[in-house]
UniProtKB/Swiss-Prot annotation:
Keywords (A to Z) from UniProt: Acetylation, Cytoplasm
InterPro entries attached to this UniProt entry: Dimeric_a/b-barrel, NIPSNAP, NipSnap_domain
Residues found modified as N6-acetyllysine: K48, K166
Chief localization: cytoplasm
GO cellular component: a single term: mitochondrion
GO terms (BP aspect): mitophagy
Listed name of the protein: Protein NipSnap homolog 3A
Alphabetical list of Pfam families matching this protein: NIPSNAP
Similarity field: Belongs to the NipSnap family.
Subcellular location per the Swiss-Prot or TrEMBL entry: Cytoplasm, Cytosol
Organism, scientific name: Pongo abelii
Cytoplasm as UniProt keyword: yes
């Protein structure tokens, strides 16, 4: 009886020990660092796209005096037309709050750009994202085009799908046909969403590289593993504006 009770106790104890799951996406470095990136999408009235961009170009210095602009693009393929997409960097949430308060008090910004241009915008969207710990923001070597690939992953978080996703990204990087700019994990917005920002010399070089990658067994194997955790995905071709820091 004692032996049976002892064996049962050990069995129950082993079942209560939760397995430790580690992931290279896991929360930690990105939260400790505090730095995050705000993704903003402005859907503009079709007849007002050029006017809006010209107005921002003339007044961009008023906005960038308050916080860092990472990049500013127009959507060419894969998304709603007449859309501009931009990324802003903040040290932490307190920093963003300070910036928003300062902008609200900046009469020059309000009067020269914001108020006159609000009527040109149909809709605005915002997401807060962190760079994943294994990726730092990279600047491309020259001007080109950008691809924003967005992946909606299954619930469970990076501990479930992070490592497989990392291997899939690196499989493409290792082929050398494209340059990885950054991998971002959404904190506010749709959860379990990952954005991968790529740079290519042109849309045609990107197409040729993708064709090559689809025939590479290393890429095929890594992607096949990652899609087990995928719900949906979308990609957009982005054209940098003349005033975008990332060209």
């Amino acid at each position: 009886m004692l032996l049976l009770r002892s064996a049962l106790t050990r069995a129950l104890a082993s079942r209560t020990l939760a397995p430790q799951v580690c992931s290279s996406f896991a929360t930690g470095p990105r939260q400790y660092d505090g730095i995050f990136y705000e993704f903003r999408s402005y859907y503009l009235k079709p007849s007002k796209m050029n006017e809006f961009l010209e107005n921002f170009k003339k007044n961009a210095h008023l906005r960038t005096a308050h916080s860092e602009l990472v990049g500013y693009w127009s959507v060419e393929f894969g998304g709603r037309m007449n859309t501009v997409f931009h990324i802003w960097k903040y040290d932490n949430f307190a920093h963003r709050t300070e910036v928003r308060k300062a902008l609200a008090k900046d009469k020059e910004w309000q009067e020269q750009f914001l108020i006159p241009n609000l009527a040109l915008i149909d809709k605005q969207e915002s997401e807060i994202t962190y760079l994943v710990p294994w990726c730092k923001l990279e600047k491309p070597p020259k001007e080109g085009v950008y691809e924003l690939a967005t992946f909606q992953m299954k619930p469970g978080g990076p501990a479930l799908w992070g490592d497989a996703f990392k291997r899939a990204v690196h499989a493409h990087v290792n082929l050398g046909y494209t340059k990885l700019v950054g991998v971002f994990h959404t904190e506010y917005g749709a959860l379990n969403r990952v954005h991968v920002l790529w740079w290519n010399e042109s849309a045609d070089s990107r197409a040729a590289g993708r064709h090559k990658s689809h025939e590479d067994p290393r890429v095929v194997a890594a992607v096949r593993e990652s899609v087990n955790y995928l719900v949906s995905q979308q990609n957009m071709l982005l054209i940098p504006t003349s005033f975008s820091p990332l060209k």
